[in-house]
Swiss-Prot record:
Region (Disordered): 639-668
Segments forming a coiled coil: 538-647
The protein's name in its UniProt record: Acyl-CoA-binding domain-containing protein 4
UniProt Kelch repeat ranges: 195-242, 255-305, 307-356, 358-407, 408-456, 463-508
Known role: Binds medium- and long-chain acyl-CoA esters with very high affinity. Can interact in vitro with oleoyl-CoA, barely with palmitoyl-CoA, but not with arachidonyl-CoA. May function as an intracellular carrier of acyl-CoA esters. Plays a role in the biosynthesis of membrane lipids including galactolipids and phospholipids.
Species this protein is from: Arabidopsis thaliana (Mouse-ear cress)
Length: 668
């Protein structure tokens, strides 16, 4: 059986020479070629330059000719280090190696100096070693993304041989082989046929698009070189799928569904990608209906042949609490208007389904706070409720992960923007009773945000598999927990009936308590103890370990400080840009206000002109009436004059004829 190590390794310069030996550098030209062939070009050149700086010193050799581009690139890398001290070059050499290959030390050759302290599994006596009346606690080293080994005095996380998972209710770190994925968080994880797939995620603010698979039988990592299906036969150069983070990865029909997620250039609506492990091909799933707006950090829950999507954060950083359902038979989206008080807008929460009827939402976060509330949606009546809970409720958290085993919902990780959640808890979904399964201490990957959690099987028993996360450092560790029967059944022994809407489906069964006790005792058989080490070497090892720990913490603090400085500088730049935009907008506002005032003055003048025209129009109407009256009077006068003229021109003949005009005048 392999003997896991629990040490931070030898001190410098021995650690540097061990790393150089692992890389294959011995100062010869052939060794440099080996390095270049094993690592990416930029990493290989930097490792070569640091090795030369540490072993030879500053570059004083003449520049190679342009006909030798490889040698010229190596010379430029070495020359760029200037007068860097040798010890600093050694430290950076090891740091870069650990960033590229975090598990290098465990895979190093046997000629690397052995560490001071060994940790052995399956000793004859499962009791801790006592020396001078003091009990030594177990020690576990968890390697982090940046390669530095963080030593944790915590027996809640132990090393396990890759072929055994025997400790119940305790997190263990199995040995894995193969190239581990780059450390990340906000990735997706799902299991198909005893293989855990890891897709996408976030690393140093960059979205990832790689796909890795872990064989859960052999614990071997491998990267999947995927293809992208073309939409038609005419398309010969399909565009690659955009890297993403904050998406959901669901196993469906021996395929993987990647739903939503944040991307560099987000689409307007939520997209669903499909990966077929048989053809190693990604393709876009064609859906119908009105899809949800593009988002990340949502929860996606498989309920029968449907996917239930809740919440998340859209591309404009607006938090959501809407509810959508995708029917996998018809591939049709449907937006649900539920009744009752829905959860507040949030992202990075966890969701589970109970009895194929009740959707449970726990935790999550907004821009300012994290939540610890539990909401239940009845999928038959589409009504939200907040039922009463039992036990000790978990602390507020976001970025946690959850899986269900029967009626039990296991919640792992998460954080509250201050620290990671150290307790792994379980909720019995029938009784709504919380209990703690395991607890970890220190800054370990399990107390991280954005980790993933899946369920696997080992010797017929369920095992929780956690991967990745971010707790100030990016992680790519695998941790396992095998819940005992007692932990999965202890909430069922409560006598109180289930409150709220879940009481109708409370069909919990009782089991033999004595067998639970036996299993619990069996789970405590495995202990990790320290080998017999003479006091002198132990004190020396402790001193070296303390110094290494202090140096590691110093480096972490320096890295955190540099990161904070970069963030502060970025925020200042963004603030300056915002102030500049604000100034421009204010100038535009003043200009618009001036234009508005001019338009208002012009409108006022127009109103005055209109009033004057109206007054003149009224005067014209009066004059028109007077004119018409005068015209009528004139016409009457002219008519009278004509009549008088006619009467005056009759003469003698008119008098002799009897003046017929007079008759006409006298006639009515």
């Amino acid at each position: 059986m392999a003997m896991p190590r629990a040490t931070s390794g030898p001190a410098y310069p021995e650690r540097f020479y061990a790393a150089a030996s692992y890389v294959g550098l011995d100062g010869s030209d052939s060794s440099a070629k080996n390095v270049i062939s094993k690592f990416p070009d930029d990493t290989a050149l930097l490792l070569y330059a640091l090795y030369q700086q540490a072993t030879v010193g500053p570059c004083n050799t003449p520049k190679p000719s342009a006909w030798r581009p490889v040698e010229q690139s190596k010379w430029k890398s070495w020359q760029g280090l200037g007068t860097m001290p040798s010890i600093e070059a050694m430290r950076l050499f090891v740091k870069i190696l650990e960033e590229d290959d975090p598990g290098w030390y465990s895979r190093a050759s046997n000629d690397i100096p052995d560490p001071v302290v060994d940790v052995q599994i399956n000793r004859a006596k499962d009791e801790p070693v006592v020396e001078n009346g003091s009990t030594f606690s177990e020690t576990k080293t968890i390697s982090t993304e940046n390669g530095r080994l963080a030593e944790t005095q915590d027996k809640d996380v132990v090393s396990e041989d890759s072929n055994t998972v025997s400790v119940y209710n305790q997190w263990t770190a199995p040995q894995t082989s193969g190239q581990r994925p780059k450390a990340r968080y906000e990735h997706g994880a799902a299991v198909i046929q005893d293989k855990m797939y890891i897709y996408g995620g976030n690393h140093n603010g960059r979205y990832l698009g790689d796909l890795h698979v872990l064989d859960l039988k052999s614990w071997t990592w491998s990267r999947v070189e995927t293809k992208v299906a073309t939409e038609s036969q005419e398309t010969s150069t399909p565009t690659l799928l955009a890297p993403c983070a904050g998406h959901s990865l669901i196993a469906w029909d021996n395929k993987l569904l990647s739903i939503g997620g944040h991307t560099k250039d987000p689409s307007e609506s939520m997209q669903v990608k499909v990966f077929d492990p048989h053809t190693i091909t990604w393709s876009m799933l064609k859906t119908y209906g009105k899809p949800p707006v593009s988002r990340g950090g949502q929860s996606v829950t498989m309920v029968g042949k449907t996917l239930v999507i809740f919440g998340g954060q859209d591309a404009k950083r607006s938090l959501l609490n809407d509810l959508h359902i995708l029917d996998l038979d018809t591939m049709t989206w449907d937006e649900i208007d539920a009744v009752g008080v829905s959860p507040s807008p949030r992202s990075d929460h966890a969701a589970a389904v109970h009895a194929e009827r009740f959707l449970l939402i726990f935790g999550g976060g907004s821009h300012a706070t994290c939540f610890d509330d539990l909401h239940v949606l009845d999928l038959q009546t589409m009504e939200w409720s907040r039922p009463a809970q039992q036990g000790d409720a978990p602390t507020p958290r976001a970025g946690h992960a959850g899986v269900t085993i029967g009626e039990n919902w296991f919640i792992v990780g998460g954080g509250d923007n201050k620290s990671g959640a150290s307790e792994s808890v379980v909720l019995n979904m029938s009784t709504l009773a919380w209990s703690v399964v395991a607890s970890v201490q220190g800054r370990v990957p399990l107390a991280s945000e954005g980790l993933s959690l899946v369920v696997s099987s080992y010797n017929g028993e369920d095992v929780l598999v956690a991967f990745g996360g971010y707790n100030g450092r990016y992680n790519n560790e695998i941790n396992l927990l095998k819940p005992s029967h007692k932990s999965t059944l202890q909430t069922k022994t409560l006598e109180a009936p289930l409150p709220g809407s879940l009481s109708a489906v409370n069909n919990a069964t009782t089991r033999d308590i004595e067998s639970e006790v036996e299993v619990s005792q069996e789970g405590r058989v495995r202990e990790i103890v320290m080998d017999n080490v003479n006091p002198g070497s132990k004190v020396e090892g402790n001193s070296e370990r303390i110094i290494a720990t202090i140096k590691s913490e110093k480096e972490e603090l320096e890295a955190s400080l540099n990161k904070e400085r970069m963030q502060t500088l970025q925020l200042r730049q963004e603030l300056g840009e915002a102030e500049l935009r604000n100034t421009d907008l204010y100038k535009e506002l003043q200009s618009v206000r001036g234009q508005l005032a001019a338009e208002q003055s012009r409108c006022f003048k127009l109103e005055v002109d209109v009033a004057e025209l109206r007054q003149k129009l009224q005067t014209l109407e009066t004059l028109q009436k007077e004119l018409e009256l005068l015209q009528r009077q004139k016409a009457a006068s002219e008519q009278a004059a004509m009549n008088a003229k006619r009467q005056g021109s009759g003469g003698v003949w008119g008098w002799l004829a009897g003046s017929p005009q007079e008759k006409d005048d006298d006639s009515p």
